[in-house]
Amino acid sequence: MHVFYTPDIAQTLELPEEEAGHCLRVLRLGVGEEIMLTDGKGCFYRAVISAATQKRCVVKVVEKTEQEPFWKGHLHLALAPTKNMDRMEWLAEKATEIGFDELTFLNCRFSERKVIKTERVEKIVVSAVKQSLKARKPVVNEMTDFRRFMEREFTGQKFIAHCYEVEKPLLRDVLRKDEDAVVLIGPEGDFSPEEVALAAEKGFQAVSLGKSRLRTETAALVAVHLMNLTHAE
């Protein structure tokens, strides 16, 4: 069954314009056909198309199902984006398929990219939510300066994965199940010493992702996978 993202389905029984176009013009579905909706907030809706025009698709909800969370705690990934945006789009897709709650792009001292089109990333995340049959959509935040991000209050565990030669435990060994967790991943040139010091001052624990040398997007995906595996029900 085809899945469509309808964040406001509780207020209006109509697909968003872009989803309606995909449903009616691309997939050529019509009145009377059954579809599945997700609001991205934890619920699936089995629905039937009740009216359709060139740009509008009205539905009748037949059944609402709340999807139990696959993990407990809030899983937050914050990273400095790579210069090649394709790699960040790949990460957004794969991390969503695995499962996490929030994505923040960081503007660090050695960042290769200072601007992110979050609308594009948002579309990729929505597509991955539908493809992987998840009822919850990760939040995608606008790019934030590293120092400003450090001013935020975080509950639970806080980690920074950097490459400086200091003693660091493996992330997998210090993650605690059911607790909120935020992991910071730096740019290809790593975090600056000042950023590492500031993070430590704010209570972020330095961790290792293993012995391999990883690209930014690979390190980020490893972090998401470890958080998900630790917190999964």
Where are these regions (language model features)?
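Short, ordered loop/turn segments at secondary-structure junctions
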Residues: K64, C108-S111, K211-S212
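Structured adenosyl-cofactor binding patch, chiefly the S-adenosyl-L-methionine
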Residues: P193-E233
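A generic structural signal for short beta-strands and their flanking turns/coil linkers
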Residues: Q11, V31-E33, C43-Y45, K55-C57, ...
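N-terminal positively charged helical leader segments and presequences
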Residues: M1-E66, E119
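RNA substrate-binding interface of SAM-dependent RNA methyltransferases
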Residues: E68-I160
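Active-site/ligand-binding-proximal alpha/beta "capping" segment
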Residues: F159-A197, F204-K211
